[in-house]
Amino acid sequence: CIRDRQVMDLGAVAHLATIAGKLPMLHFFDGFRTSHENQKIETWDYDELKEMVDWNAVKAFRERALNPVHPHSMGAAEQPETFFQHREACNTAYLETADIVAEYMDKVNAKIGTDYKPFNYYGAPDATEIIVAMGSVCDTIEETIDYLNEKEGTKLGLVKVRLYRPFRADKLVEAIPSTCEQISVLDRTKEPGSEGEPLYLDVVAALKGTQFHDCLLYTSDAADEAR
């Protein structure tokens, strides 16, 4: 999230998707920006939010909660052979959450006229070079793209990652213009000793076997060497 309004909008998406998907969700945003500036925004009406709540999921959540009236165990110890299977089995629920998040983004878009997606594209429709990034840095990148495309005739674009986990490779590929030849990935973290940072490695894996497989890929620690 970049601006106060986006924090509020996507905060609603995170809460609604958590209820429907039965999984906790981490909603992160630029805390410095939102706490050091004033913006006029139209706040959500609770009745509008109430219309989008899955009340059957809320009821099921309350029934699953620890309660002495209907006791059950949670977090029981397991042997390695069964724990491994259960950890793999739960991955399905995480993958399904991506569709739930996209569904609530669409509902929010319909109500307030926004265009939130798991991956939003900004820039020239026929861009040859794009950046993949997340967070408040996208605001600066957008301004730079506008200037360079208008003043210097470049064809640049930006893919903004709004949903990082679960990472939907197909949604990323859909967001990239078919004319793309070079991709630079800006990560939010540094992992010394790793072949690459998390977002970069996700992008590499997502593009494998697609029309963008031969695109030049760059990351912050390999600016002078295509990978």
Predicted feature locations:
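Single conserved hydrophobic/aromatic residue that forms the stacking wall/gate
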Residues: 1-2, 218-227
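Short acidic, glycine/serine/threonine-rich loops at helix termini
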Residues: 9-12, 36-43, 142-144, 170-171, ...
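Conformationally flexible catalytic loops at phosphate/diphosphate-handling active centers
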Residues: 25-120
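A general structural motif
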Residues: 100-116, 133-141, 162-168
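Redox- and metal-dependent alpha/beta enzyme cores, enriched for Fe-S-associated oxidoreductases
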Residues: 126-151, 167-172
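Metallocofactor- and cofactor-centric catalytic cores in central/energy metabolism, strongly enriched
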Residues: 160-169, 182, 200-209
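Phosphate/diphosphate-binding loops
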Residues: 194-205, 216-220
